[in-house]
A protein has these predicted regions:
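Flavin-dependent oxidoreductase catalytic cores
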Residues: 1-313
Length: 313
């Protein structure tokens, strides 16, 4: 019996690729996604991520991972890297992932006005004194408008979380700048009404993201890659202008689109590779590798995306 039944047309999918200082063994990249487990069920979560690595994924990521108690999304199951106890929980996952030769990534998350902090009872930090914005959460909440000291604190909390991520064994550390959370608020001129160096012109509105990418790169110091998750949309030209200002800062771009129903829509209604055109336009602006999603199930489609230089993973 033939030992290798793989169609040689698909060999490119199994080629290794460098992501900054680390190398994925292939082009199969599990982007951050929720699991229903989070910090409450670390053993089950580690086993699930480990099964993915055993199945052949080159990179396996966590779900959104809070950097500080001011970003608490109870009762939704999120991950956390608040203190050293969380390092132990995450080490369970990274050990399982590494056991099968895959890289482990963590998506550091700052909530903003989409959260209520039902668990910690701390005021959520946002760009306005404003009721919380997540219409799926039927609890009253109020965001406290951030001042410069809050920005300074968040940068410190993010650096501290990146340090813990290294201690937990992660190979890729994210700056999470999409899906409506705090960094998205900075980008959006409708929510960012600041009059200081973090508001106004686009160069100012991307400043905080730029600082967090640079902070994270300094902390990981070549021991892990820095990824940035970011949205671009063909109907939003400024999203590409913002992307261009940051284009070569991280080691990897994890690109999506602003419309959740397209990014995560049912395959009955959303065609395979639905994000292709949006991602390609951004891909042409950066020299760094790009990963994206899009209900990809056909290896032929995956190969086409790589051959056409739409994305790298």
């Amino acid at each position: 019996m033939c030992k290798n039944m793989r169609d040689p047309r698909h060999d490119i999918l199994f080629e290794p690729i460098n992501i900054g200082p680390v190398t994925s063994k292939n082009r199969f990249y599990q982007v951050p996604h929720c699991s229903g487990m989070g910090w409450r069920r670390p053993n089950t979560l580690a086993a699930m991520r480990g099964v993915k690595a055993e199945g052949g994924w080159g990179v396996v990521n966590t779900e959104y991972c809070s950097i500080h108690p001011t970003s608490d999304n109870d009762a939704f199951p999120y991950c956390a890297l608040w203190d050293n106890e969380d390092i132990i929980s995450h080490r369970k996952m990274t050990d399982e992932v590494h056991k099968h030769g895959a890289l482990a990534g963590v998506e550091l998350w700052i909530g903003g006005s989409l959260i209520v902090n039902l668990g910690t009872r701390l005021p959520p930090l946002g760009l306005r004194n404003h009721p919380q914005q997540d219409t799926s959460v039927y609890h009253p909440g109020q965001t406290r408008c951030m001042d410069k000291n809050d920005i300074k604190n968040i940068r410190k909390w993010h650096r501290d979380a990146a340090k813990r991520a290294l201690e937990a064994g992660f190979d890729i550390v994210y700056v999470y700048a999409t899906h409506g959370y705090l960094l998205s608020e900075f980008l959006n001129p409708e929510t960012n009404i600041r009059s200081d160096e973090y508001g106004g012109p686009l160069e100012n509105r991307v400043r905080f993201i730029k600082e967090l990418i640079e902070d994270t790169r300094e902390i990981v110091d070549g021991k892990a890659a820095v990824a940035t998750r970011f949205s671009v949309g063909l109907n939003d030209s400024e999203s590409y202008d913002a992307f261009a200002l940051l284009a070569d800062l991280p080691d990897l771009w994890d690109l999506t689109v602003p419309d959740y129903s397209v990014e995560m829509g049912n395959s009955r209604f959303i065609k395979e590779a639905a994000l292709k055109d949006s991602v390609l336009k951004a891909r042409q602006l950066t020299s760094k590798p790009v990963v994206s999603v899009g209900r990809l199930t056909s290896p032929d489609t995956m190969v086409q995306l790589l051959r056409e230089n739409v994305q790298d993973l």
